[in-house]
Amino acid sequence: MSDNLDLVRSIYADWERGDFRSAEWADPQIDWVMADGPLQGTWTGVAGMALGWREWLSAWKDLRVEVDRYFELDEGRVLVLTRGIARGAASGIDTGEMRAESANLFHIRDGKVTRLVIYWESRDRALADLGLEG
């Protein structure tokens, strides 16, 4: 297993425990990108990523991320197919459980994630963007 894959696995170990605060793995100028979903955009830097995470996480309670599969790609990239399971927190109304088949694309250089693209609603879009089949 490569160092890049080990790094991404360690990030998911944190996320699977609900720890979305640690950022030792992130390059100081990371681009954190939400490609789709209710919160779309790009946040730059560790502070920007933290702001994006806070905005994103405030919409959900009991968010869990489960990994289906890891793919080590070329050029320091790792694609992870995931499932997100959560309950909506907006307006205090229980919206029921939400499930999403998602994908996250990590760009890694010198042991740090320089770009993280989150495809919350469509792993098929991630696969298509990368020229892979779903």
Regions found by a protein language model. Give the residues of each.
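C-terminal and inter-domain tail/linker signature
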Residues: 1-134
